[in-house]
């Protein structure tokens, strides 16, 4: 089991420094691959459409996933509902490359997340803080991402979550070893993982940014804040010029600390996706609060 988990962590590590794009058709997947995406997330609807339509959002139709998988050579991810281990079993049977246990879909279980150790396939999970991140890793997640607030085109929550996680990691590194058990209790996280973070000053898996990233500048901001890479959901194919936006965001992640290049790639992209002021959303419409 440990060998399999180390392999899964290494598979996620190979995506470091890259962009993972949400796609709903094989044609979009091809655009993403040509633009330089390191992986795609196969969906029936991007988060902005899930948010607009409401109702219960579930795992995508296997037919769509298989068509997208056949269209590209890069890894393909797909989402399952929090706690819905049967959806995960189906995706594993389809030969998907990564499973995202996602708060963007309607949770199937409000108490339990999926036992990711029961699967051979690597899992991605969202987190708002270090405790959440370490609990998901303790369940077997091979990759963490900020939850942000998907489908809004508003990066503020992704920034908040990344800063919180980084600050909590930094705090752990200042603690004495005899203080770490109390920290584990406070974080509600496994002691061994808390100890690892305190000793290494980082998570034991890669931590990507996600949720509300809509422009090259947003992507570069998250990279400068310490993200290992970026997920872009609605931001590309809800923009005015998806092909150009996709290429620009990939370049922005590569050259995130080069303002001259960022200025160049941000030029002439047309209008970004329509955005939402998160302060005006009802509590029930906030995806990030799903899961624990």
Curated annotation (Swiss-Prot):
GO biological process, one term: pyridoxal phosphate biosynthetic process
CDD domains in the record: pdxS
Entry superkingdom: Bacteria
Residues annotated as the enzyme's active site: 79
Gene Ontology molecular function terms on file: pyridoxal 5'-phosphate synthase (glutamine hydrolysing) activity
Binding site for D-ribose 5-phosphate: 22, 151, 212, 233-234
Metabolic or biological pathway: Cofactor biosynthesis; pyridoxal 5'-phosphate biosynthesis
InterPro entries per UniProt: Aldolase_TIM, PdxS/SNZ, PdxS/SNZ_N, RibuloseP-bd_barrel
Binding site for D-glyceraldehyde 3-phosphate: 163
Catalytic activity: aldehydo-D-ribose 5-phosphate + D-glyceraldehyde 3-phosphate + L-glutamine = pyridoxal 5'-phosphate + L-glutamate + phosphate + 3 H2O + H(+)
Top-level EC class: lyase
Keywords, sorted A to Z: Lyase, Pyridoxal phosphate, Schiff base
Coiled coil spans: none
EC number: 4.3.3.6
Pfam families with a match to the protein in the record: SOR_SNZ
Quaternary structure annotation from Swiss-Prot or TrEMBL: In the presence of PdxT, forms a dodecamer of heterodimers.
NCBIfam families per UniProt: PRK04180.1 (NF003215), pyridoxal 5'-phosphate synthase lyase subunit PdxS (TIGR00343)
Known role: Catalyzes the formation of pyridoxal 5'-phosphate from ribose 5-phosphate (RBP), glyceraldehyde 3-phosphate (G3P) and ammonia. The ammonia is provided by the PdxT subunit. Can also use ribulose 5-phosphate and dihydroxyacetone phosphate as substrates, resulting from enzyme-catalyzed isomerization of RBP and G3P, respectively.
Family, as annotated: Belongs to the PdxS/SNZ family.
The protein, known as: Pyridoxal 5'-phosphate synthase subunit PdxS
């Amino acid at each position: 089991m440990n060998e399999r988990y180390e392999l899964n962590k290494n598979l996620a590590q190979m995506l470091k420094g890259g962009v993972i794009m949400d796609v709903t058709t094989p044609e979009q997947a091809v655009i993403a691959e040509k633009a330089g995406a390191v992986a795609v997330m196969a969906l029936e609807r991007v988060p902005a459409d899930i948010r607009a339509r409401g109702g219960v959002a579930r795992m995508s139709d296997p037919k769509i996933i298989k068509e997208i998988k056949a269209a590209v050579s890069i890894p393909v991810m797909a989402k399952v509902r929090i706690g819905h281990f049967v959806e995960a079993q189906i995706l594993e049977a389809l030969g998907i490359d990564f499973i995202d246990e996602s708060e963007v879909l309607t949770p199937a279980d409000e108490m339990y997340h999926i036992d990711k150790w029961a699967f051979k396939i690597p899992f991605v999970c969202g987190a708002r803080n270090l405790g959440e991140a370490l609990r998901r890793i303790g369940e077997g997640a091979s990759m963490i991402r900020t939850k942000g607030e998907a489908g809004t085109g508003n990066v503020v929550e992704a920034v908040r979550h990344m800063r919180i996680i980084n600050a909590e990691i930094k705090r752990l590194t200042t603690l004495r070893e005899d203080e770490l058990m109390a920290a584990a209790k406070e974080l509600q996280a496994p002691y061994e993982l808390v100890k690892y973070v305190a000793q290494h000053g980082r998570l034991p898996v890669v931590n990507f940014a996600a949720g509300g990233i809509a422009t090259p500048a947003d992507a570069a901001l998250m990279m400068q804040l310490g993200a290992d890479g970026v997920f872009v959901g609605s931001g590309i194919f809800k923009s005015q010029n998806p092909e150009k936006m996709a290429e620009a965001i990939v370049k922005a992640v590569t050259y995130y600390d080069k303002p001259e290049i960022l200025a160049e790639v941000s030029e002439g992209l047309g209008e970004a996706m329509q955005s939402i002021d998160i302060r005006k959303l009802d509590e029930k419409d906030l995806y990030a609060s799903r899961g624990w």
